[in-house]
């Protein structure tokens, strides 16, 4: 199987998001890369499901709460930008203040 660098990046994010979900299920607080991966995966999958950019910008900020991440992580992440493939093409989705 031959994957482009973009496809490899998508797989790495998806795998990191899976690890993050398992840790949340066990009650483990997420670190910076896990938090970014989980929110990014949510946006990418939402785009794949046909949700709008505006909807994902709002919904992306509801994926994680402060109490689910390690201390200081919410303050470190001011915005997350994700390039996602929508039915009408690839678009950049920006989630402002993603952990509230």
Curated annotation (Swiss-Prot):
Catalysed reactions, as listed in the record: urea + 2 H2O + H(+) = hydrogencarbonate + 2 NH4(+)
Protein source organism: Magnetococcus marinus (strain ATCC BAA-1437 / JCM 17883 / MC-1)
Pathway of action: Nitrogen metabolism; urea degradation; CO(2) and NH(3) from urea (urease route): step 1/1
NCBIfam families xrefs: PRK13241.1 (NF009712), urease_gam (TIGR00193)
Principal localisation: cytoplasm
Location in or out of the cell: Cytoplasm
Annotated GO MF terms: nickel cation binding; urease activity
Assembly and oligomerization: Heterotrimer of UreA (gamma), UreB (beta) and UreC (alpha) subunits. Three heterotrimers associate to form the active enzyme.
EC number: 3.5.1.5
Protein name: Urease subunit gamma
Family of the protein in this entry: Belongs to the urease gamma subunit family.
Gene Ontology cellular component list: cytoplasm
Swiss-Prot/TrEMBL GO biological process terms: urea catabolic process
The entry's keywords: Cytoplasm, Hydrolase
